[in-house]
Amino acid sequence: MKQGVFVAIEGVDGAGKTVLLEAFKQRFPQSFLGFKTLFSREPGGTPLAEKIRALLLHEAMEPLTEAYLFAASRTEHVRQLIQPALQQKQLVIVDRFVWSSYAYQGLIKKVGLDVVKKLNADAVGDSMPDFTFIVDCDFETALNRMAKRGQDNLLDNTVKKQADFNTMRQYYHSLVDNKRVFLLDGQNQTGCLEQFIEQLSQCLTQPTLS
């Protein structure tokens, strides 16, 4: 069997990524289909990356500065947590990865996709996800969920305009190829979990992983 499997969960704020992962973690807290499972998040995942996360969530800054900090956090995350876990043949599931930087800083904050991709090239290296799952929902659902959780931060504020939300949603949709990147229906959170389990099971048992 190859060394580990790297899975990223993506989508706009309010789509239900974190709820999905918490539900999955409750059902499969330590392993899934024979893989020991490591759960993490971005920004964050290591002590230093979590300190950078606090800055990103609560300190106003220039969009380019924000892009650099995301890349710095990701460098620590990849090298200190993700790569070692993959070398130990674990299943690594991360709440957000590089696609979020492309969407938020590259598109919405207009730093530019090429600029953000260049910043993250060294941070990520060859450690791109084997599979990415994009949790999708409509604008009203996302807003209602963010309002109910009542934990406002600077990143949440980015997608409270429908035009920006639509831009991000369209970008995420453009990534879907149903081979490495899959779309999950986040409107129904119970159904989303079952869809994720079924699709992830298919991904982990395909011949290319053996």
UniProtKB/Swiss-Prot annotation:
The yes or no answer to whether the keyword DNA damage is present is no
Enzyme kind, highest EC tier: transferase
Residues noted as binding ATP in the record, renumbered to the chain:
11-18
The cysteines joined by S-S bonds are none
Show the Gene3D superfamilies listed in the entry.
P-loop containing nucleotide triphosphate hydrolases
Where does the sequence pass through the membrane?
Answer: none
- UniProt xrefs under InterPro entries: P-loop_NTPase, Thymidylate_kin-like_dom, Thymidylate_kin_CS, Thymidylate_kinase
Catalyzed reaction equations: dTMP + ATP = dTDP + ADP
* Gene Ontology terms, MF aspect: ATP binding; dTMP kinase activity
A Gene Ontology annotation in the biological process aspect, one of them, is:
dUDP biosynthetic process
Record's SUPFAM superfamilies?
P-loop containing nucleoside triphosphate hydrolases
Return the EC number. Answer: 2.7.4.9
On the tree of life, the source organism's domain of life is Bacteria
Could you list this entry's UniProt keywords, alphabetically sorted: ATP-binding, Kinase, Nucleotide biosynthesis, Nucleotide-binding, Transferase
Give a yes or no for keyword Transferase in this entry. yes
Similarity comment: Belongs to the thymidylate kinase family.
What biological function has been recorded for the protein in this entry? Phosphorylation of dTMP to form dTDP in both de novo and salvage pathways of dTTP synthesis.
Stated name of the protein = Thymidylate kinase
Native organism is: Mycoplasma pneumoniae (strain ATCC 29342 / M129 / Subtype 1) (Mycoplasmoides pneumoniae)
List the gene name. tmk
